[in-house]
């Protein structure tokens, strides 16, 4: 009995850690590829890196890149207005935290938004036959976990991943526009703990001050995990950074820090 309980305990701990690891991979792909790369053109990718990111996102999130990009670009074009897809200033931060996914889906499914904000990302043959099939991607990802680790661990890991990914990315839009520090004069905020959970996305104030910068950390003590992936990718020519300099933030946009 003791042996069984110990084995069960370590299986659960491993499954939770596995779910967290899967989410970390998904968050890195989201921030580096979807956000900094496709949405803001801060960096470009080699064909192998481009294909790898598409595959990872398909298996872990089912996201269609052009839809994600369209929603995000609309957010920047209409930040904290009625046209913002997920503004806590309009809807309340707790409402956005709880309903961010529904808000995202509403805008993502509207083809007029994709045509307007992501015209440069036309679907190719792989999108039409594979990557646009979200449920197939998620099902394949779960099936891989089942084959590698068994149904018990796979089920827990998948549950942890889904909840972690949705909650953390909702927090960027909700908490990241309500609580935290504002070293630059915009409505977004910086939160190191949120940045650690989202591979750098918690430095939302920095990002809104310099949206085309590939590096979200602006100060020596800020930890941007996405940048830690980008740098070695540039060494191996898997990515090329176009913009990462703090000169993108003009002195006129800086203000005093507030909590």
Residue ranges of model-derived segments:
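Non-catalytic, topology-defining segments of multipass membrane proteins
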Residues: 1-171, 213-259
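Glycine-rich, pocket-lining loop/helix-strand segments that form or immediately flank
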Residues: 174
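Active-site-proximal inter-transmembrane loops
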Residues: 117-125, 183-210
């Amino acid at each position: 009995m003791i042996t069984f309980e110990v084995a069960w305990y370590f299986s659960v701990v491993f499954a939770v850690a596995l779910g967290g690891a899967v989410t970390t991979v998904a968050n890195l792909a989201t921030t580096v590829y979807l956000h900094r790369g496709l949405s803001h053109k801060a960096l470009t990718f080699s064909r192998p890196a481009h294909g790898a990111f598409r595959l990872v996102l398909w298996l872990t999130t089912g996201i269609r890149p052009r839809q994600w990009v369209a929603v995000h670009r609309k957010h920047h074009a209409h930040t904290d207005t009625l046209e913002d897809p997920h503004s806590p200033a309009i809807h309340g931060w707790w409402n956005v935290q709880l309903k961010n996914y529904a808000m995202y889906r509403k805008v993502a499914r509207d083809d007029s938004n994709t045509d307007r904000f992501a015209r440069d990302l036309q679907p190719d043959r792989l999108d039409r036959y594979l990557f646009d099939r979200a449920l197939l991607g998620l099902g394949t990802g779960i099936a891989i976990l089942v084959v590698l680790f068994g149904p018990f661990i796979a089920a827990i890991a998948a549950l942890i991943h889904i909840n972690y990914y949705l909650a953390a990315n909702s927090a960027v839009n909700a908490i990241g526009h309500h609580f935290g520090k504002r070293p630059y004069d915009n409505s977004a905020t910086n939160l190191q703990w949120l940045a650690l959970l989202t591979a750098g996305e918690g430095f939302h104030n920095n990002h809104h001050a310099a949206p085309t910068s590939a590096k979200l950390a602006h100060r020596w003590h800020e930890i941007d995990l996405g940048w830690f992936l980008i740098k070695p990718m540039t060494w191996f020519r898997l990515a090329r950074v176009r913009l990462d300099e703090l000169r993108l933030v003009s002195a006129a946009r800086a203000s005093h820090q507030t909590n």
